[in-house]
Amino acid sequence: MGPTASGKTDLAIALRQTLPVEVISVDSALIYKGMDIGTAKPSKAELELAPHRLIDILDPSESYSAMNFREDALREMAEITASGRIPLLAGGTMLYYKALLEGLSPLPSADPEIRAEIEAKAEQIGWSGLHRELLAIDPIAGKRINPNDSQRINRALEVFYITGKTMTELTAQQGDSLPYNVLQFAIAPQDRAVLHQRIEQRFYKMMELGFQQEVEKLRARSDLHKDLPSIRCVGYRQMWEYLDGDISLDEAIYKGICATRQLAKRQITWLRGWNSEITWLDSLDPTSSKLKMIEKIAQNSIKL
């Protein structure tokens, strides 16, 4: 696990060359086909060295949930262990990790009629008005959800209208835990400034590789729009705004870099607050040092 641009892919590839592991991607952006540059998807050469499961499994027009991920990951893990190898989960979508490790709370399925009612109400009082309503119903979720995040506001209210219980109440009820012995490692630079620099450098590199053209191709599709989960991914959202004429290219790049840094901050905060035992690895340490530490801990825990 680790924040974006921390070196997770490079370490996963090195582990694939060293240990009997198979990589499973834990990334809510890498699941989408045709979204390669802006997601920093592993290259063809990298995937030849270390094939990643759960990459390129959906069209950008489709949605994917933590429940979907848990089901898919458990299936892949069963196949890997049946072949005598070890599942190596690598990525930065912390909600997916949480769902996999702890199971899912009993949240109801989406109800199109209730969602339509919420959206109709949003047209009358705005999403900010609905956010105030959410704060009154579920203060914890309301404080956590951004007033501009219509998707999450809609879902939180929908859950309450369906069940009569708040999202906070329901998510406190855990599902089935993971039936595996799990070793958890987090990778990040100790110096936050280093991570910020990496993020900026990578964003400009993505622009050189044709990120704008990648988004233009997506935007040309009539079935894609800015409110889809795929297009809401950091970088894509800001580039879409530029192509819509809402902001300049320089603003899109700046906002994209800022959004990526904010994502990294949330990922690190989540990891710091995670109540399970995590071994931290410094991104700047030599790969050989990180491999030795992982091998030592693994040898003490599982039979390789």
From Swiss-Prot:
Q: Which domain of life is it from?
A: Bacteria
Q: Which PANTHER family match?
A: TRNA DIMETHYLALLYLTRANSFERASE (PTHR11088:SF60)
Q: What is the protein's quaternary organization?
A: Monomer.
Which gene is the coding source of this polypeptide chain?
miaA
Which family is this sequence assigned to?
Belongs to the IPP transferase family.
For this protein, the Enzyme Commission number is: 2.5.1.75
Which residues does the annotation list for site: Interaction with substrate tRNA?
A: T93, R115
Record keywords: Membrane included?
no
Q: Which residues bind substrate?
A: T4, A5, S6, G7, K8, T9
Q: Which GO terms describe its molecular function?
A: ATP binding; tRNA dimethylallyltransferase activity
Coiled-coil region(s): none
For this protein's source organism, the top of the classification is: Bacteria, Pseudomonadati, Pseudomonadota, Gammaproteobacteria, Pasteurellales
InterPro entries, alphabetically?
A: Dimethylallyltransferase, IPT, P-loop_NTPase
Give the required cofactors. Answer: Mg(2+)
Instruction: Please give the residue ranges the record annotates as the region Interaction with substrate tRNA.
Output: 27-30, 151-155, 232-237, 265-272
Under SUPFAM superfamilies, the record lists: P-loop containing nucleoside triphosphate hydrolases
**Which protein is depicted?**
tRNA dimethylallyltransferase
Some GO term, biological process aspect, for this entry: which one? Answer: tRNA modification
- Residues binding ATP are G2, P3, T4, A5, S6, G7, K8, T9
Protein role: Catalyzes the transfer of a dimethylallyl group onto the adenine at position 37 in tRNAs that read codons beginning with uridine, leading to the formation of N6-(dimethylallyl)adenosine (i(6)A).
* Record's keyword annotation contains Nucleotide-binding: yes
Query: Which UniProt keyword terms apply here?
Result: ATP-binding, Magnesium, Nucleotide-binding, Transferase, tRNA processing
Q: Which HAMAP family does this UniProt record tie to the protein?
A: IPP_trans (MF_00185)
What does it catalyze? adenosine(37) in tRNA + dimethylallyl diphosphate = N(6)-dimethylallyladenosine(37) in tRNA + diphosphate
